[in-house]
């Protein structure tokens, strides 16, 4: 099952999500990416549903998606200007924070990564947090960068857990 926000992906992207055949069903959700993610999390948390079917995710809710992404960063760092030991600095689009989380995993595993900076669009949940506010999910705003249109990035709590406190998290990003 694939869930995606109706009207928030291009026709080409929608085709790519819908063309898999009989064993994969794609559903357009009247809402945002956050709404799709909420539905997926509800399904994963439903014990009756989990007893009937095997569930998993292919997005960054799952560490199974994040670990291969960490390998991309290790590969990039290994080939960065051909200079061993020279850290690779990153600017990562925010979205659901899966890529940023993967970068932190890669660095924790010893990949020579320098600064990890986040790029945000009009969905400013994280800039509000970094500007000294409390973390508070925001309604999703539709932009041209639909992969970044997330008002409640799931991996924020994961990043928060990996740092001692919010000050350390802010310093790391």
Regions from the PLM with identified roles:
Residues 1-173:
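PLP-dependent amino-acid enzyme catalytic core
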């Amino acid at each position: 099952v694939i869930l995606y926000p109706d009207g928030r992906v291009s026709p080409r992207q929608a085709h790519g999500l819908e063309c898999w055949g009989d064993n994969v069903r794609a559903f357009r959700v009247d809402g945002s990416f956050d709404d799709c993610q909420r539905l997926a999390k509800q399904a994963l948390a439903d014990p009756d549903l989990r007893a009937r079917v095997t569930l998993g995710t292919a997005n960054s809710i799952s560490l199974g998606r994040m670990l291969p992404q960490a390998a991309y960063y290790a590969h990039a760092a290994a080939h960065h200007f051909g200079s061993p030991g020279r850290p690779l600095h990153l600017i990562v689009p925010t979205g659901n924070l899966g890529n940023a989380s993967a970068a932190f995993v890669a660095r924790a595993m010893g990949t020579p990564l320098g600064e990890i900076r986040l790029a945000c669009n009009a969905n400013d949940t994280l800039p509000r947090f970094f500007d000294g506010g409390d973390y508070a999910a925001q309604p999703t705003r539709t932009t041209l960068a639909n992969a970044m249109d997330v008002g409640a990035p799931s991996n924020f709590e994961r990043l928060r857990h990996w740092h001692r406190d919010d000050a350390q998290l802010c310093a790391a990003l």
